[in-house]
């Protein structure tokens, strides 16, 4: 079982949460925000166990309620997710959950409502939840978990205690991964890709590491506009990898910008030679322009522009920078 002490890099806020729930002095709603993989869900689970625990040191992890929380079978813990086949949490799902809140707890203790992807609530669902947060039931605690707090109504945020989680430094993340059994070489690569988020680093598989090399080879080989189409065609049909493609490229660009600004070299970051050439050839201004182009590509995708069109704008910008700065 993970413990509060295992949530490294969050000592101050975790200490406060542990204190509140061990003493039963918690508030009715918490908003846990921060990048994915920083421990938000683990913290919510630990707080849930502490709120329901019957042991002396909360959470003990051994009593019946703690074990039921860990196994996902506690009758007073409810998780709100979209209906099967849907991406959005609608008002129907929210009303059904709130109906359970009105019923007496099964184990004569607290009731816990977990909303692990709170940004997926539509406006109607959020307004429905807001009414309950304005007049919260006794002995009920809500955990809204999200990496996109701006997607929530300000009135919902104002009725929650906001707890912000932060990534570790890459060095601290690397040490944690080594402690968890990763090789030093793999830990270094994963810590950089995950930007210090331990949970995210643990989810990185060989496919993502291979993509890092493959993508930086193909993308930074686009020296002329005519080269762009072939690279677009490599990824346009693979919808599962498209977000990963943009995320991986953004991390690579971030590292390149650091080198262009006089910081650490990208030579040992697991990128293809072509990315190293770009970092050495194009000045900081070009890297910043490319990062802005990538940001606009993400906006295009959010506006339902086809991935091929959005990705092509990035590739064409790369070829334009090469044209400006020939060898």
Place the predicted regions along the sequence by residue.
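Charged, glycine-rich active-site and insertion segments that engage polyanionic ligands
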Residues: 1-49, 65-68, 138-140, 147-327
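Conserved catalytic/switch belt of AAA+ P-loop NTPases
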Residues: 102, 127-144
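Clamp-loader machinery-focused feature within the broader ASCE/P-loop NTPase space
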Residues: 1-124, 279
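Catalytic acidic motif of RecA-like/P-loop NTPases
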Residues: 116-122, 127-134, 150
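Conserved adenine-binding aromatic site and its adjacent loop/helix in ATP-hydrolyzing domains
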Residues: 99, 131, 154, 158
